[in-house]
C-alpha cells in the first residue's frame, strides 16, 4: 500500500492512496488547481486512479475532484444524498459500501452532522491484516476538534446528529486506528484545530475536548457555542461545487 497526505490551500488536507502491486489508486478531497499533483503521483507510482472521492460537498474551497476524475477517467464519488442537489452525474456512495483499490479496501461510513452528506473512509490494507489501519475523517472529526455543525443551517439538530455519528461510527473503532482529517489549524471548518495532521482514535478520546463530553445535550451546547465565522465565499463555492 502507498499513502500520501497533501497539504493544500485553506488548511485543507487531501489524500492519495492505493495499491502499487495491483496498480490502483484513490484520491480524496482534491482542491481545485491541485489536479496535476495527483496525475503526476499516479504516473510516478505507475497506478491508475479509479475513484476520486469528496467526503462532502465543500463550502470552504473549490473542489478539483470532478476535474481530476475526468482527467483520469475515474469515478467521481459523493454520498448518495446529493442526488437531487448536484447538477451532474456522479458515482453514489452508500453507508457500508466498499471500494477496492487492489489490496486496499475502503469502507464508506456515512457520518452526517457537519453536513448531511458527510462520509468518513475506513481503510484496510489486506497485505497488512484484516483489521482497519486508519480512517480519513473529512470534516467530521479533526485532531483536537470537531467539525462545525452549522453550514447546512439547523445547527442544534446537526450538532446532535454529529454526536451520534461520531459515537456510533468512529469511537467504536479500535483505539489504535489512526485518523487523518480533512483540515488542520487555520481552517474555518471547526474551532480549535491542531496543527498536527494526524492522530489516533485513542488519543482523541483522551485529549479532544469535544470527545470528553459524553452527554449529547452538553455536546450540542459546546459545539454551537464556539462556531467560527462562515467561509467568506461559502455560497459561491457550494454553487460551483454542485454546478453542471
Describe every region a protein language model picked out.
Residues 34-77:
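Active-site metal-binding motif and surrounding structural segment of the metallo-beta-lactamase
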Residues 149-156:
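Short glycine-enriched, charge-decorated loop/helix-capping segments at active-site entrances
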Residues 82, 88-146:
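Active-site-adjacent scaffolding segments
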Residues 1-48, 121-138, 144:
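Conserved beta-strand hairpin/beta-sheet module of binuclear metal-dependent hydrolase folds
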Residues 34, 57-62, 83-86, 116-117, ...:
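Active-site environment of divalent metal-dependent phosphoester hydrolases
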Residues 27-30, 48-58, 77-80, 110-113, ...:
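Active-site neighborhood of phospho(di)ester-bond hydrolases with catalytic His/Asp-centered motifs
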Residues 128-129, 133-134, 144, 156-244:
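Divalent-metal (often Zn2+) His-rich catalytic cores of metallo-beta-lactamase-fold enzymes
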Residues 17, 29, 56, 68, ...:
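Divalent metal-coordination and catalytic microenvironments
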Amino acid at each position: 500500500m502507498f499513502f500520501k497526505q497533501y497539504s493544500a490551500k485553506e488548511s485543507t488536507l487531501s489524500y492519495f492512496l492505493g495499491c502499487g502491486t495491483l496498480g490502483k489508486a484513490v484520491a480524496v478531497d482534491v482542491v481545485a488547481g491541485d489536479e496535476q499533483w495527483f496525475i503526476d503521483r499516479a504516473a510516478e507510482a505507475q497506478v491508475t486512479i479509479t475513484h476520486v472521492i469528496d467526503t462532502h460537498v465543500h463550502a470552504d474551497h473549490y473542489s478539483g475532484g470532478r476535474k481530476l476524475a475526468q482527467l483520469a477517467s475515474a469515478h467521481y464519488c459523493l454520498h448518495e444524498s446529493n442526488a437531487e442537489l448536484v447538477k451532474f452525474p456522479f458515482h453514489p456512495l452508500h453507508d457500508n459500501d466498499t471500494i477496492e483499490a487492489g489490496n486496499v479496501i475502503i469502507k464508506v461510513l456515512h457520518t452526517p452532522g457537519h453536513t448531511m452528506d458527510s462520509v468518513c473512509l475506513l481503510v484496510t490494507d489486506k497485505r497488512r491484516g484484516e483489521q482497519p489501519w486508519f480512517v480519513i475523517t473529512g470534516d467530521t472529526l479533526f485532531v483536537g476538534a470537531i467539525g462545525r455543525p452549522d453550514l447546512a443551517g439547523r445547527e442544534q439538530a446537526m450538532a446532535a446528529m454529529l454526536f451520534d455519528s461520531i459515537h456510533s461510527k468512529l469511537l467504536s473503532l479500535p483505539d489504535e486506528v489512526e485518523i487523518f482529517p480533512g483540515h488542520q489549524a487555520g481552517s474555518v471548518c471547526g474551532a480549535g484545530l491542531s496543527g498536527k495532521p494526524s492522530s489516533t482514535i485513542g488519543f482523541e478520546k483522551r485529549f479532544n475536548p469535544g470527545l470528553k463530553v459524553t452527554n449529547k445535550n452538553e455536546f450540542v451546547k459546546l459545539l454551537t457555542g464556539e462556531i467560527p465565522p462562515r467561509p467568506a465565499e461559502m455560497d459561491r463555492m457550494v454553487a460551483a461545487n454542485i454546478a453542471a
